[in-house]
UniProtKB/Swiss-Prot annotation:
HAMAP family: Pept_M48_protease_HtpX (MF_00188). The active site is at 144. The chain crosses the membrane at residues 14-34, 39-59, 158-178, 198-218. GO terms for cellular component: plasma membrane. It is an enzyme of class 3 (hydrolase). The keyword Lyase does not apply. It comes from Streptococcus mutans serotype c (strain ATCC 700610 / UA159). This is Protease HtpX homolog. Belongs to the peptidase M48B family. One of its GO terms (biological process) is proteolysis.
Length: 299
């Protein structure tokens, strides 16, 4: 059951990334049709921008992410119990020892970052370290180490980059639509144009307007799938599903983080740091904890 769940989540994430690139191609085609008279040319430019964004984000420094979240690096002498749990989980997962950080915040939360296991880091809040017992903390750290081992952070980073690329291209297209005249000006030379031109024009306008929203939804879906996979992988590392389940139950009762967390960082945490309510599951950065517990109970 555990390995089937891991394989299923990996397949779903691949599908979501394919959808992301299709969305990027669609918005590129829309802008290309309106301003370059070339669907293919617009698609090519959009995909190139997407790849540039993705690679630049992959090599972004871990220090920047930690600074954005007010995290402080610690040594084994400062917090030996926490440090040794990270060390143990990394050893079981057969990855290099990540750098270890702590966030001075009373809420219960943790996250991992880095483009690969070789330059990864783990951070936990002081609230988490104070409330969780060893088995529960092993479950949480196992979850974060699983993100590193499974290259989840790289996938999440690519998703952020592609969403940013879609938003950029859509913004450019929108500005050109308002200030440039675009194809509508050239279309005056082609009276009539036929139904195909009208359909393509409508498609292009809708793509420019709706693509950023669609990109955000795909990004959130990728984040949710990664959380399910990391939960399952943590149990694989600790061989203790009850420890992870009890940790999730405590996380469910946690308050939002005291310091402000930007939207890009929110998806990295094991628990939604903003604790938004009143929204449909479609707009959550994380799957409902009750669903995560239910899946672990089936292991």
């Amino acid at each position: 059951m555990l390995f089937n769940q891991i394989a299923s989540n990996k397949r779903k994430t691949i599908v979501l990334l394919i959808v992301f690139f299709m969305l990027l191609a669609a918005i590129g085609a829309a802008v290309g049709y309106l301003w370059l008279d070339s669907l293919v040319g617009g698609m090519a430019i959009a995909l190139i921008i997407g790849f540039i964004y993705a690679f630049s984000m992959i090599f972004q420094s871990t220090n920047i992410v930690m600074a954005m979240n007010n995290a402080k690096e610690i040594t084994v002498d400062e917090m030996p119990d926490y440090y040794h749990i990270v060390e143990d989980m990394a050893m079981v997962a057969q990855i290099p020892m990540p750098r270890v950080y702590v966030i001075d915040d009373p809420s219960l939360n943790a996250f991992a970052t880095g483009s690969s296991p070789q330059n990864a880091a783990v951070a936990a809040t002081t609230g988490l370290l104070a409330i969780m017992n060893r088995e529960e903390l092993e479950g949480v750290i196992g979850h974060e180490v699983s993100h590193i081992r499974n290259y989840d952070i790289r996938i999440s980073t690519i998703a952020v980059a592609l969403a940013s690329a879609v938003t950029l291209i859509s913004s450019i297209g929108g500005r050109m639509m308002w200030f440039g005249g675009g194809r509508s000006r050239r279309s005056n030379d082609n009276e009539g144009g036929g139904y195909l031109q009208i359909i393509l024009l409508i498609f292009s306008l809708l793509a420019i307007i709706l693509a950023p929203l669609a990109a955000s939804l795909v990004q959130l879906a990728i984040s949710r799938q990664r959380e399910y996979l990391a939960d399952a992988s943590s149990v694989e590392l600790t061989r203790n599903p009850q420890g992870m389940i009890r940790a999730l139950q405590k996380l469910e009762q946690s308050q939002p983080m005291a310091h402000s967390v930007d939207n890009a960082s929110a998806a990295l945490y094991i628990n939604d740091p903003k604790k938004k309510s009143g929204l449909k599951h479609l707009f959550y950065t994380h799957p409902p904890i009750a669903d995560r517990i239910r899946r672990l109970e089936q292991v």
